[in-house]
């Protein structure tokens, strides 16, 4: 049985128990939400994975993308990135490799981390042919099965890209057409072959494979906007309607899903996007890249993505895909992965401060930091900081003889007021 089947029968599995304990929520609530598809716990039955909960009442989760490109194939470097991502707090990693021995890369990444691992099988299907459009539907489904057999916990499938959404795209005024790599493969394949997307046309077969391995489907946003001018157009929302229908079919088949969301969205349209996705996709957990809130910040898109992610979290986003400083520019380095992840952790924590479920635990951290700052307890501040080592290095770089920081020294507002009160109290 799949995890969702067990949950529908009220069976609290070890994975559900682990998630409940981690999140500080009673197991029955987690079980009920898994049964309804409101929480996803991506754990392939072929792999020992640290269970994480994504969705309602869960703390905001973060994914880190790693993997080779055809220009840069260094498997050891990608393994280091995956390990670093886990060490710095990522809850999942995705192997997006397109260059080199894809089977070897994926196998090594699966062995190198304990957290859930996701992939995009169509990349391997496309790599099996000289030209992307020459891959067959068998290539696509065989890739999904291979990844499932190897223990991949969740796969992105762009099943919402179909002939209907293609027509919406043709009739639209989009500037950037399709910026999703998997979406572009699918669209090009449909145009070349004159057929509908196999992942859509044969979605029931896809569900059979996923169910056999209890593998979660991440329903990809092949029509996501690539610039803020395209943020709220018909192709995007048409895909959400389709994805919502597929979510229902997956739940009926006892296959877990979450839904991927838009890339570039201005601040004032994020609520529309996120609430629209939640409504159209029947409350499924939402997995967002960003969204990036401006197009003019290459080199700083980890920041534009964190801004968008924090706002999206106010309206229902559950799972953030971190963005690195290299976004739109190059394959990210190890340092890019660390920087992007830490910035995304800041965004995730700001979401948890207001999210039902993790809110109380998140507030405890901020309150503890407030008391540590009030008391000028630097060691406690470093302990509580998202990146305590970085905080310590900054403070140590410009030391002061006082117990304050070098910005204010003896003019520290906290110290002045504290000493003033102490003096007044001693006189009374």
Curated annotation (Swiss-Prot):
Gene3D superfamilies: 6.10.250.620, Radical SAM ThiC family, central domain. It is an enzyme of class 4 (lyase). GO terms for molecular function: 4 iron, 4 sulfur cluster binding; carbon-carbon lyase activity; zinc ion binding. Binds 1 [4Fe-4S] cluster per subunit. The cluster is coordinated with 3 cysteines and an exchangeable S-adenosyl-L-methionine. It catalyses: 5-amino-1-(5-phospho-beta-D-ribosyl)imidazole + S-adenosyl-L-methionine = 4-amino-2-methyl-5-(phosphooxymethyl)pyrimidine + CO + 5'-deoxyadenosine + formate + L-methionine + 3 H(+). GO terms for biological process: thiamine biosynthetic process; thiamine diphosphate biosynthetic process. [4Fe-4S] cluster binds at residues 405, 408, 412. It comes from the Archaea. Pathway: Cofactor biosynthesis; thiamine diphosphate biosynthesis. Its cofactor is [4Fe-4S] cluster. Its EC number is 4.1.99.17. Zn(2+) binds at residues 264, 328. HAMAP family: ThiC. Belongs to the ThiC family. This is Phosphomethylpyrimidine synthase 2. It comes from Methanosarcina barkeri (strain Fusaro / DSM 804). The lineage of its organism: Archaea, Methanobacteriati, Methanobacteriota, Stenosarchaea group, Methanomicrobia.
């Amino acid at each position: 049985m799949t995890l969702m089947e067990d949950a529908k029968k009220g069976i609290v599995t070890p994975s559900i128990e682990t998630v409940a304990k981690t999140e500080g929520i009673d197991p029955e609530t987690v079980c009920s939400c898994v049964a309804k598809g409101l929480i996803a716990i991506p754990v392939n039955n072929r792999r020992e994975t640290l269970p994480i909960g994504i969705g309602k009442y869960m703390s905001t989760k973060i994914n880190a993308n790693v993997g080779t490109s055809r220009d840069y194939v260094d498997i050891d470097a990608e393994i280091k990135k995956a390990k670093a991502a886990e060490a710095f707090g990522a809850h999942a990693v995705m192997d997006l490799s397109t260059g080199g021995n894809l089977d070897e890369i994926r196998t090594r990444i699966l062995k190198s981390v304990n957290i859930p691992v996701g992939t995009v099988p169509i990349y391997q299907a496309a790599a099996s042919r000289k030209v992307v459009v020459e891959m067959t539907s068998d290539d696509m489904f065989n890739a999904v099965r291979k990844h499932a057999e190897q223990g991949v916990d969740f796969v992105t499938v762009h099943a919402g890209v179909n002939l209907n959404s293609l027509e919406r795209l043709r009739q639209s005024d989009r500037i950037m057409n399709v910026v999703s790599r998997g979406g572009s493969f699918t669209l090009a394949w449909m145009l070349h072959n004159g057929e509908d997307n196999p992942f859509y046309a044969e979605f029931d077969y896809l569900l059979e494979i996923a169910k056999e391995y209890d593998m979660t489907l991440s329903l990809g946003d092949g029509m996501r906007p690539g610039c803020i001018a395209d943020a709220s157009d018909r192709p995007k929302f048409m895909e959400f309607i389709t994805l919502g229908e597929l979510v229902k079919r997956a739940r009926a088949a006892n296959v877990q899903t979450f839904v991927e969301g838009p890339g570039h969205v201005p601040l004032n349209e994020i609520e529309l996007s996120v609430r629209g996705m939640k409504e159209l996709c029947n409350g499924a957990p939402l997995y967002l890249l960003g969204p990036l809130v401006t197009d003019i910040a290459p080199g700083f898109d980890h920041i534009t993505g964190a801004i968008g992610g924090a706002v999206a979290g106010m309206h229902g986003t559950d799972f953030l895909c971190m963005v690195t400083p290299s976004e739109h520019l190059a394959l990210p380095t190890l340092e890019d992965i660390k920087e992007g992840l830490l910035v995304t952790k800041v965004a995730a924590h700001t979401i948890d401060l207001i999210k039902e479920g993790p809110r109380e635990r998140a507030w405890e951290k901020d309150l503890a930091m407030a008391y540590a700052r009030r008391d000028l307890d630097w060691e406690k501040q470093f302990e509580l900081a998202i990146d305590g080592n970085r905080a310590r290095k900054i403070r140590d770089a410009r030391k002061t003889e006082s117990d304050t920081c070098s910005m204010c020294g003896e003019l520290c507002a906290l110290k002045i007021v504290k000493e003033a009160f102490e003096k007044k109290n001693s006189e009374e």
